[in-house]
Design a protein with these regions (language model features):
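A subset of solvent-exposed loop/turn segments in beta-rich extracellular surface proteins, enriched
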Residues: 280-281, 289-296, 452-465, 528-541
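Acidic surface patches and DE-rich sequence motifs
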Residues: 59, 72, 82, 788, ...
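Extracellular/periplasmic, surface-exposed regions of secreted and cell-surface proteins
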Residues: 157, 205-207, 211, 413-432, ...
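Conserved small-residue
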Residues: 266-348, 596, 815-922
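Short, small/polar-rich motifs associated with maturation and membrane association
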Residues: 1-395, 399-411, 423-424, 845
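Conserved small/polar residues in nucleotide/adenosyl-binding loops
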Residues: 923-927
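Detector for glycine-centered tight turns/loop "hinges" at secondary-structure junctions
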Residues: 62, 85, 104, 212, ...
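Low-complexity intrinsically disordered tracts that form flexible linkers/tails across taxa
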Residues: 280, 427, 435-447, 840-846
Length: 927
């Protein structure tokens, strides 16, 4: 009885919630089928042609289902069941009723006057299959930290152009960032931290697999081709992939055709736009100039001079006058700069008064993007196929000489059943992307965006006498174009043999080729040189000199061959014991080649080509050629008893060419277990609320080979010049051999993970939690300090360091479908991790390097207290401000030249209490 009351109470809440929400959307419309017909003849005729139906909806135990939807198929006519599971409505004779409720399978039945409909439990959520390493498992049977991404929610229902950005915020622990906001830029993907290992070349970037084969970037994949996405987070779930899965795996499968399905041609498109988000506000001319003067006055100066402009009190007043007179006019109305109106020369110095908004002049309010997808899929009883084409076009945010990005995708999957026991498959994936943008004469923190916002708003961005002033806008407008083209081709051939029931033997071979080509076309930028402090009206035909009068061509080539062979055997015993065993091996070879050529002095700026340049030619450090090979043997055992007690054991024996021949191979085991408490008889009391509850834990270790190649080899550097001249020529020299450890081998990444997964209210509400600890041991780090008599003070790297990360992840999702057809989906995620170096050879613990106890991401520096106030300072007879050291600590260490601290400046804390700010610590032992 108590269980029935709880069930009814829960159902009542759902019933009244559904009624309230549906009332908001439907009002008093046509759902009320029993409403009296109107007086017109049409209403009378409609009512005469309908029959009254009473529907009772129950579950398989005969309990009434409250709030179930009862809808006349093909119409909006319907209702919801009451507290007794009953719904009454008028429908057309012969109508089909659709009866549904969350957590139950929808039924379609022919309408009769009195009906009883039994809804069965919908086991879809319990039977949901998640793609894991070399196979798939029921979600409820997972024992590792595996997140399944709802592709429909994350990708299909949104105008997604980049899969990485679509995953942002979907899975806790998966961090997606971009360094810049431009188009065609790859995202940085990190899983459970940012560092993982101090020797990792790409930090905690997970392995990206599409149909079990690595792809170099998610930007190469068309979002429309994706069927499923799984994120394998802990060692137990990711270890099956071995060599490069130390930081987890993002596992993607692409769409395939269906058997006995007629050919389906699908076309979709999306037109959208992007806008700048948070933009800085630049002060008005006179406001910025006044602030500059106030700062200068504090140091005893009455004017400000920088590059080609000057500011004094007269200039501030004239800026106000200009703003009051012309501030309401647009730049097009104002036209070119006019001497006397917009700027003037006084005493051999130039003063500028005109107001500019460089962001408004330089950037669009919005920029378009479009994508198109065309696919053909289908199948017979033997063969299935899915072929798709995709096109994406994005334009940049610049108003002049804007950048543009195009991506073309082709993907084809074909599967054929040759015999009952033998099938073959083929997949071809091709992606081509091209990005075109103006050549950048400056880079890093001094790029065009930096210079666009560096100068005050009176900096001249208009022409004078038909010639522009030097600025970021001038640089972009006059720049030649540079381009980057990526071509990625992948061909996969595979076969599956089923010699006996339950046994599947798979063979797969994949060839992949990535080719990048970049062409940078330099030139010259000229105009009035605002960086000439003596006379900004000096014409300069080449602001950046001969360095950028060049053409650069770069190419990268990566070819890989991957072979996989694995067998899976499944068997159930007495319908209680379920066993799955998998064994296999994989091998990979990879060749990388890169080249860059740079030639100066272009004959014609409009035709920037290597053979049309006549100056010096250079080959830079991006030229390389290297090879890599890896292989591994793996096995996995899955066991469950009645779907309640779950166990998984993995092992890999991996080898990598990155280590010495005697240390290339190592064994990496893992184990995980789970317990579905919700299936126990003692948990029946929670069933009305608790749909499923599982606790799980895992331990495992994976080898990390994401380290510098050939670090165990002693090499000698070759230098072009020794400084010695013999026979009129400089003599090259070869350096002494580098000091290395000949036994440098694998780093080991060990993860402990404890978590639970729970679902409530007929699977509407889900909660998942994980606590984990990841330890990278045998980390490549400096060995013991060598004596100076050894001949080299460079410490060779050895397997001695250790880095540990601890964190947690929480995910909550809610899915609700109301009687009126309205659906509600909500998701919240939370994650936190702290990475700490627990072993490292740095006896002095210099804070500018790595040391034992260092928290990754920590910042050493002065602690700020507040801003200096007037009462902290005093003025001398000349009106200059000084700090009163009787009241606050002296900051004289950083008072240089004419600058003195005063009101409004940042005040540093005196941590050691000696009354003055001194230099910061160099070693943690000084603290």
């Amino acid at each position: 009885m108590n269980e029935d009351r709880k069930k009814r109470g829960l159902a009542n809440g759902k019933f009244f919630t559904a009624v309230a929400i549906c009332a908001l959307f439907l009002g008093s419309g046509n759902v009320m089928a029993a409403q009296t017909a109107s007086n017109d003849s049409q209403g009378v005729q409609e009512q005469m042609q309908s029959i009254s139906v009473t529907v009772t909806v129950v579950d398989t135990k005969g309990e009434p289902i409250i709030g179930a939807n009862v809808i006349e198929k093909g119409t909006t006519n319907g209702g919801i069941t009451d507290l007794d599971g009953v719904s009454k409505l008028n429908v057309k004779p012969g109508a089909i009723l659709q009866v549904s409720f969350v957590g139950y399978t929808t039924q379609e039945v022919k309408a009769t006057s009195v009906m009883k409909v039994v809804l069965k439990d919908d086991t879809e959520l319990l039977d949901e299959v998640v793609v894991v390493g070399y196979g798939a498992q029921k979600k409820v049977n997972l024992t590792g930290a595996v997140a399944n991404v709802d592709v429909q929610e994350a990708i299909a229902s949104r105008p997604v152009t980049d899969i990485a950005k679509a995953l942002q915020g979907i899975t806790p622990g998966l961090s997606i960032t971009t360094n810049v906001g431009g188009i065609g830029v790859d995202s940085n993907i990190k899983l459970r931290g940012a560092t993982g290992s101090l020797s990792a070349t790409e930090g905690t970037s997970p392995l990206i697999l599409v149909d079990n084969v690595e792809v170099p970037s998610l930007s190469l994949v068309n979002p429309d081709d994706i069927a499923s996405i799984s994120v394998l987070k802990d060692a137990a779930s990711a270890s099956i992939y071995g060599t490069r899965a130390a930081w987890g795996v993002v596992l993607i499968t692409t769409k395939t055709g269906k058997k006995n399905d007629k050919p389906r041609v699908t076309y979709s498109n999306n037109f959208s736009w992007s806008t700048p988000t948070v933009m800085p506000q630049v002060a008005k001319t006179y406001e910025g100039a006044q602030a500059m003067l106030l700062a200068a006055n504090r140091s005893g100066a009455s004017t400000v001079s920088s590059i080609g402009y000057n500011v004094d009190e007269i200039a501030v007043q004239k800026m106000k006058e200009w703003y009051n007179t012309y501030g309401g006019m647009s730049q097009s109305e104002l036209g070119e700069m006019q001497l006397g109106r917009d700027f003037e020369e006084r005493g051999g110095k130039y003063y500028f008064y005109r107001q500019f908004d460089p962001l408004d002049m330089f950037m669009k309010d919005w920029t378009p993007q479009q994508k198109h997808n065309l696919s053909v899929s289908g199948g017979s009883d033997k063969t299935t196929y899915n072929i798709s084409l995709g096109y994406l076009n994005q334009q940049g945010i610049l108003k002049v000489n804007t950048d543009e990005y195009d991506r073309y995708n082709f993907n084809a999957n074909v599967n054929t059943q040759i015999r009952d026991w033998w099938s073959v498959r083929a997949n071809v994936m091709f992606s081509r992307s091209t990005k075109s943008e103006p050549y950048q004469y400056t880079s890093g923190y001094t790029d065009v965006w930096y210079y666009l916002l560096r100068w005050p708003s009176f900096y001249p961005y208009a022409d004078y006498q038909g010639i522009p002033f030097r600025s970021a806008m001038t640089e972009i407008a006059q720049a030649n174009r540079e381009s980057l083209t990526n071509n990625f081709t992948r061909v996969n051939l595979g076969t599956t043999i089923n010699p006996i029931k339950g046994l599947a033997i798979n063979f797969d071979y994949t060839f992949a080729l990535l080719n990048d080509y970049q062409k940078r076309n330099g030139g010259e930028v000229g105009g009035w040189d605002m960086f000439n402090s003596s006379n900004p009206l000096t014409y300069n035909s080449s602001f950046y000199g001969a360095t950028h009068n060049r053409v650069v061509e770069r190419s990268r080539y990566t070819m890989s061959n991957t072979f996989k062979a694995y067998a899976t055997y499944e068997k159930s015993f007495v319908q209680k014991h379920n066993l799955k065993v998998m064994v296999g091996m994989d091998a990979e070879t990879r060749e990388k080649l890169g080249h860059s050529s740079d030639r100066r002095t272009l004959v014609n700026f409009d035709k920037p080509e290597i053979n049309l340049a006549i100056g010096d030619q250079y080959v830079d450090g991006t030229t390389y050629h290297n090879d890599f090979a890896a292989a591994g043997f793996f096995g996995r055992i899955n066991y469950d008893y009645m779907g309640k007690y779950l166990l998984e054991v993995n092992a890999r024996y991996d080898g990598s060419s990155k280590f010495p021949s005697g240390d290339q191979w190592a064994l990496f085991p893992s184990v995980s277990a789970g317990w579905r408490l919700s299936e126990e008889t003692f948990m029946k009391w929670a069933k009305p609320v608790l749909s499923d509850f599982k606790v799980r834990g895992s331990w495992g270790t994976i080898g990390n080979q994401d380290v510098a190649a050939n670090s165990f080899l002693s090499v000698m550097s070759v230098n072009k010049s020794s400084g010695w001249v013999i026979d009129g020529k400089q003599v090259p020299y070869i350096g002494i051999p580098s000091v290395v450890s000949p036994s440098l081998t694998w780093e080991r990444v060990t993860t402990i993970d404890l978590g639970f997964d729970a679902r409530f209210f007929n699977n509407e509400l889900g909660v998942s939690f994980d606590w984990y600890q990841r330890t990278t041991s045998d980390m490549h780090s400096p060995g013991e300090t060598l004596p100076s008599t050894f001949g080299s003070t460079t410490m060779p790297k050895v397997n001695s360091g250790e880095l540990q990360g601890r964190g947690f992840e929480l995910s909550i999702d809610y899915n609700k479908r109301f009687a009126c057809g309205l659906g509600l989906t909500a998701r919240a995620t939370l994650s936190k991790i702290r990475e700490k170096i627990t072993k490292y050879n740095n006896p002095n613990k210099n804070i500018y390097g790595n040391y034992e106890g260092k928290i990754i991401g920590e910042i050493w520096g002065y602690e700020t207290d507040r801003l200096f106030q007037y009462e902290d300072c005093y003025q001398d007879a000349d009106g200059k401000w000084f700090i009163d050291t009787n009241k606050v600590p002296s900051q004289a260490l950083y008072e240089t030249g004419a600058f003195k601290y005063g009101p409004g400046d940042v005040k540093y804390k005196d941590l050691d209490g000696n009354g003055e700010i001194t230099y910061c610590l160099l070693y943690t032992s000084d603290a």
